[in-house]
Each structure stands twice: as structure tokens, then as C-alpha cells.
Amino acid sequence: MASASSPEGASSSSPEKVKMVTVLSIDGGGVRGIIPATILAFLEKELQKLDGPDARIADYFDVVAGTSTGGLLTAMLTAPNENNRPLFAADELAKFYIEHSPSIFPQKNWVLSKIAGTLRMVSGPKYDGKYLHSLLREKLGDTRLDKALTNVVIPTFDIANLQPTIFSKFELKYKPLKNALLSDISISTSAAPTFFPAHYFETKDDNGQTREFNLVDGGVAANNPTLCAMSQVSKYIILEDKEDCDFFPVKPTEYGKFMVISIGCGSNHDQKYKAKDAAKWGIFNWLIKGSSAPIIDMFTSASADMVDIHLGVLFSALQCEKNYLRIQYDQLTGSAGSIDDCSKENMDNLVKIGEMLLDKNVSRVDLETGHYVDVAGEGTNRDQLAKFAKQLSDERRRRQNEPSN
């Protein structure tokens, strides 16, 4: 969290100033990133109403976390420009997707494209990723993780070690070899198996030591990175010296002192598979079934939903549900549920879904059915985001006005 007029990031807050840890988390979901982009544009406008036109998302959150397309949004919101301010304003994000997605996910004739895409997925990734790679390198340049304007957490999965690799600004003091280019991190977290190629790169520290990374989409490990972000904060609090820790005296178990906004890219819980049908599937059907990839749909939905369920129970048990706002739409149908349908019609529809989601009632996941149900008396997501914006603004002003010791 930083002043809109200051180049300093969240880590500049002194220990006595932090009473609430503010977290923004963005799920993965391909071109459906237009949905959270639309919601974030509204949130930033609310912050600008309170603090002026220069206010940016990165000024208000101690941690911004994102997986896959959420990782791209995270990098765009927190990477510095030549004035050490966020590279993108939130209202530019959806426009960025609409402009570049057709080149990231190139599709020609629909029928021929579907056949060709299926054939490519049998022998290699559906897309070569060249446009995405060049675009990210152009936009993010040589900016490394340590230059992000606030603390950033972006999950990936290392296929050489078969374990998650989390790029966290919190860890750089102890793990300098993770200080990778934001472009490499963004390419890696969005390298969805069967859609984009795995990404390899190396880093080198000041002592000449190197580390190799063999990475794929962070959604394999944590498609909803909220819990990952909160865990990084807790680990930081435990490891850091009290006089250096930005979040002291927040105790690692005091989740009631977290203020969390978690935004999904939408899902389709109505598209179910039957055991009788799946029992007959071979490798091909698990990877490609109609316009979807069942195995990928399952692990990304499972990882995201498990986090949502866990956090719902946690904040409820601590009687601080109002500190956790999850915005997700689980009734996507047709092309809207695709991660790579970048037709103008579908992208325009995703913008409308994001706007519609703002006016839907606040909802929480039902632990029995897995569906989202309205929460009585909480109003709409638009109402809650406006309230959160006021709290974020108040917390930022309090930190700015409280004298340092």
C-alpha cells in the first residue's frame, strides 16, 4: 500500500502503522480475465472518488496475488512505469484483453479452427504462445519482481520438481534467485497445459549462482491464490525480525486482521460429467470433450473451490465474514465458459457479465452443493466494493497520517 503521490510500495509501511493486512486475489481463467478486469475498474473508480484521479489499485493493497490470467492482471497492476507508478490503470485492463486476445488465441474459420486446434492439442500445445511472450516482454520489459509497487504473489508449477513454485516479493530477502523478470513469471503462470507451451528460464544472483525454472500454469497448484497470499504474509511475519516486519504486531493466526477481496473469472458448475460416461473415457476424452478439457476443468475448479470453501469456513469461524468478499459467477454457459473464445461477441459478453456481477447480491459458496447462494442483508457486490473502497481509503490515510516512531 502506498501513497498515490509516492513511489514507495506497500513494504514501506512501518510496523506500528499496520492494523489491517489488505489482500487482493485474482483467479485464473484465460480470456475470462475480462470479468475481474471489469470489476477492478469499478473498484479503482470508487477509490478515485475518495482520493483523486491518480489513485491506483496498487496503492491500497499490501498484497496483490494472481494465478494464470490473474497473474497477468497482477503484473499489469503492480509493474512500475517510467514514473514509478502502475503501468496500467484498472480501466485499461479489459481493453487490453479485447485488443490482444485475438492474437494470443488466434482462431480463423470456426469449424476449421476447432478441428485444427484439436489436432494440435494431440501433438502439442494448441497455441505457440509467441505473441503472448513478445507482448509481455514488450510491456513489462526488464522489470523484476523486486520492483513491483507492492507485495506480489504469483503461483506457478515446476514440472521438473513436481511442486508449486510461488513467486513472492516477500521471499526475495531469503531467496534472491526467485527475483525473476515479471515477464517470465507472467508467461509461466499462464502456460496452461495443452493450451500453451511450458516455459523455461534461468535466474542469476549477485554471487553468480543460477537457478533453472521449468514452469507451467499456476492453476495446476492454486487457481484461486487467496490462501497462498495469506500464507505468504503469515510466513513473512514468522520469519522477519519484528523491527523490520511491515505487518507486526499482526499475529499469523489473527486472520480477522485480514481484509480480502477475491475475484474469480467465472465457472460453469452446470456442465457436469457422469461417472457412467467418464468410465469409458480414454486419454483423449479426458483431455478433449466437445469444447472443453475435462481434466483441466476439474483440477482448476477443484483448487479454486477448495480455497473458497476453506476461507469461507475460516472467516465464519472467526466471526469476521465482512472482512472477506468473494466475487464469483458459477453459471457461465456456452462460449462464456471457454478460456480461449476471443470472438468479439464473447468478449463483449464477458464485459457484460462483469457488469452484471457487480449488481448481483453478495454470495458465498454453499458447503453442501458447491454453488453460490445469496447472503441476506449484504446488498450487492457493487455496494460491498464501495464499502471496501472506503475502508481501504481510510486505512491508507491512517497509515499516512500516523507519525512514525
Swiss-Prot record:
Protein name, per record: Patatin-like protein 2
Motif (GXGXXG) on chain: 28-33
Any GO MF annotation of the entry: phospholipase activity
Written domain comment of the UniProt record: The nitrogen atoms of the two glycine residues in the GGXR motif define the oxyanion hole, and stabilize the oxyanion that forms during the nucleophilic attack by the catalytic serine during substrate cleavage.
SUPFAM superfamilies with a match to the protein in the record: FabD/lysophospholipase-like
Gene for this chain: PLP2
Residues spanned by motif GXSXG: 66-70
Motif (DGA/G): 217-219
PROSITE patterns, per database record: PNPLA
Domain PNPLA positions: 24-230
Active-site residues per Swiss-Prot or TrEMBL entry: 68, 217
Enzyme class: hydrolase
Function comment: Possesses non-specific lipolytic acyl hydrolase (LAH) activity. Hydrolyzes phospholipids as well as galactolipids. May play a role in disease resistance.
UniProt-listed Enzyme Commission number(s): 3.1.1.-
